[in-house]
Amino acid sequence: MPVNFFATIFQTLLRNKEKELIRWPAEEGSSKNYTGHELLEKIGAIRMALLNQHITPSQPVLLAVPVSIDLICALLAIQAIGAVPVLPPAKAGAGGLLKVIRDRKIRFVVIARSPNLLRRTAAWMKNFKFIMIHGLPEVHQEILVTDVPPAQPALVSHSSGSTGAAKAVYRSHAVLLAQHQVLKETFPPWPDQVDFPLFPNILLHNLAAGTTSVLPDIPRFELSKVDPAVIAGQLIREGIHTLTGNVYYFKKLLAYFEQHALYFLCVQAIGIGGSPVPELLALSLKKIFPRATIFIIYGSSEAEPIAVRMVGDEPVHPLAGYKVGTVSKHIQLALAPAGEVVVAGKRYPVGEITIKGPHVAISTGTEALGTGDFGYLDEHNELCLTARKGNELICKGLQHYQLEQALMQDQRVERAAAIVRKDGFHLYVQGNIGEQEISNILKKWIDISVIKSISKRNRIPVDQRHLSKILYNKVR
């Protein structure tokens, strides 16, 4: 049966024409607010610009637009006509964009403003055309949504590249609809909820649910430029109820909020994801947001969420790995056997986590998605992560996430990477802590002979998107 993910958002916008659905940061602490009606107008204008170029259903269209309201509306307009929006990899330069254009056989590239001579020359040489969308005139014409096959891609994005080069991720209309339903079921929205999403997929989910989204005021949406003082002002001024983010983001906020003795009573729930979440971070956030329930959300570009854990007051065992909680009832999860790990004297079968289900994007010709994460199910049937593919060797009942989580219990440790080789583990630690102190932490939990070296590093390399996932193949 033909579908279109945008149809869900379209109907929500029609029902909420007067409601502010997006508050986008503007200059000097202000925001530009967009009602359902205003969003429909912008989407309609871009839709007409696309149709004027005779773009057809299933045709890929590259979005070379900075993170902005224009980007969101262009993405939705492309979906509306049944075409396929393609997002480039994080921080892709000109060469990266041209590679996407070549690999995906793209003929149309959406940009905000008029291209310079160099861009026009590249377009002529590579046989593609620019479509400018900023400041388009209003179009007084009803938006018609084009139905497409459920398996047609609704969005092409790229992974973070934590296990190598960023790979294209194809999410179909059926998968996006299923992800929206699972998120809605897992975290039911409530009337007048004000959310503060860092992740773009949550913004799309909010639009489909009719939840107001306030976007974090981050320059050019480059996470490394986040100013915790500005975010604090937004949380207070906008009356934020819920917020999501990754480890880098919440670490930056936490350090500033603790330093200035700030706490926020309006926030009712926090979701942390995007990479393994240190237990100490999750517990520390409970002090800053005393009325909030803290959730650890485990997912991937292909499936969101896979598992969710509500963080209690007591930390998990330091060698448990990263505990991510209860697997979604809509997910069929299996562990490709790799051996056993030991936690507090108990042995658990461990393996690569493979999943399938209605909200999982699976490549054609494969039966299940290999997540690249290794883990086990504990006695409460909760999922714990123990390793990342490429660094998954088991040594004396241990995998690298177990050691890293144990070290991250100490607030002096900013990052830790345990590289496993045949002889044992080689530790690389970033933070204000000495090698002997690192050794003393681990002696409490393991036979220290498994540690073959400890090295301090000023910076441990991480991915470009989340700034949180360690690039183990680049740790030296």
Set out the residue ranges of the language-model regions:
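Conserved C-terminal "lid"/linker of ANL adenylate-forming enzymes
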Residues: 417-418, 441-476
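Conserved AMP-binding/adenylate-forming
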Residues: 283-297, 301-382, 389-391
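Conserved AMP-binding/adenylate-forming core of the ANL superfamily
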Residues: 22-55, 59, 64-68, 76, ...
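Conserved AMP-binding/adenylation subdomain of ANL enzymes
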Residues: 177-194, 199-241
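AMP-binding/adenylate-forming catalytic core of the ANL superfamily
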Residues: 236, 243, 250, 351, ...
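Conserved pre-ATP/AMP-binding loop-to-beta segment of ANL
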Residues: 17-20, 140-158, 164-165, 188-193
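Adenylate-forming
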Residues: 111-121, 217-220, 238-284, 295-303, ...
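Conserved AMP-binding A3 loop
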Residues: 33-37, 154-181, 212
